[in-house]
């Protein structure tokens, strides 16, 4: 496989990278030589699997850092950006992947269970829309993006219980 990002000091900042599309993106980009920074929020019960997954990324001979934090908290975002300035040294973020999901699976109509309310939609819009804007703005203002950076955002229609 061609490692077109190898030795270029380019990074992927992946928000929500401990599972699903975020993790798959991290693995694929690492295979192509891109350094990886994953922001995640997981429980201890998922820690062993996550460590195995993260180990696979480091086996691609790329730089790797991870932060277990709430990506939706402005003060945590600010702390992470300051940490990245040091961690990346003179490297830049080539791609920001927003793969965090927060919402609920309530139905719109039902006679037997609680249905969606306005605050449910506001929570989802904040987490999956405004959060993307806030992260892009913060990374841009910190001058951490490369000149030809990309932003990728995944959304979800949810899972079933």
Task: Name these PLM-found stretches.
Residues 45, 68-83:
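The beta1-alpha1 cofactor-binding region of Rossmann-like NAD(H)/NADP(H)-dependent oxidoreductases
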Residues 43-49:
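Short, charged/polar "capping" segments at the starts of alpha-helices
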Residues 10, 94, 122:
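Conserved acidic residues
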Residues 2-39:
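Canonical Rossmann dinucleotide-binding motif of NAD(H)/NADP(H)-dependent dehydrogenases/reductases
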Residues 54-75:
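Rossmann-fold cofactor-recognition segment
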Residues 58-65, 80-99, 103-109, 117:
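A glycine-rich helix->loop->beta "capping" turn
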